């Protein structure tokens, strides 16, 4: 409160911009709450229709190496082998490209970052006229925290917790009690 007006805006449920504030201008820092599914579909449509991107839906089943050890292509379950100039590993903790192909070990930070597991839910509003929170609500729990993000059509609620200090069953109970 002593260094920023953001705290006051948040607790009063106010937006960080006024109707007269120009696009992408701001008086205080802010971020947008986005429906990840709708945003992904928007990006897919924009890239395919406007940028000429070819969108393929497939699971990567293997990596084909070039002679120098780089990735020449990836093998997929339904699209065959796909060649590209750039591959981004989106396989999560499986680390198919970075870990399995290149041998890059996961760099654990569990000694300082305890929260390693998350549960998430999409919760509809009780009624269409329910207020949408202007900020992410964060609520401390026994071994983590719950986030509550208001979106136009629903709330995104999740529980991030330490699996060393809480069981999935207990974390689920805490999340359901919050909801």
Question: What residue spans do the PLM features occupy?
Answer:
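Predominantly flavin-linked oxidoreductase catalytic cores and closely associated redox partners
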Residues: 21-174
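Flavin (FAD/FMN) cofactor-binding and adjacent substrate-gating region
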Residues: 1-33
